Amino acid sequence: MEALVYTFLLVGTLGIIFFAIFFREPPKIEVKEKK
């Protein structure tokens, strides 16, 4: 049970970080493409 909780926390943290990076990168690429 503990392993499942740790895995869920790890996946959740990585997901949040990946989501934040993915959401922050597109605008910069779009601005560069428009320019």
Curated annotation (Swiss-Prot):
Homology family: Belongs to the PsbT family.
CC per GO annotation: chloroplast thylakoid membrane; photosystem II reaction center
Keywords: Chloroplast, Membrane, Photosynthesis, Photosystem II, Plastid, Thylakoid, Transmembrane, Transmembrane helix
Function as written in the Swiss-Prot or TrEMBL entry: Found at the monomer-monomer interface of the photosystem II (PS II) dimer, plays a role in assembly and dimerization of PSII. PSII is a light-driven water plastoquinone oxidoreductase, using light energy to abstract electrons from H(2)O, generating a proton gradient subsequently used for ATP formation.
Annotated localization: Plastid, Chloroplast thylakoid membrane
Record-given protein name: Photosystem II reaction center protein T
Membrane topology (UniProt): Single-pass membrane protein
Subunit description: PSII is composed of 1 copy each of membrane proteins PsbA, PsbB, PsbC, PsbD, PsbE, PsbF, PsbH, PsbI, PsbJ, PsbK, PsbL, PsbM, PsbT, PsbY, PsbZ, Psb30/Ycf12, at least 3 peripheral proteins of the oxygen-evolving complex and a large number of cofactors. It forms dimeric complexes.
InterPro entries in UniProt: PSII_PsbT, PSII_PsbT_sf
Transmembrane segments: 3-23
Any Gene Ontology biological process: photosynthesis
Any single Pfam family the record assigns to this protein: PsbT
Record's keyword annotation contains Metal-binding: no
Keyword field contains Transmembrane: yes
Top-rank lineage group of the source organism: Eukaryota
Species this protein is from: Zygnema circumcarinatum
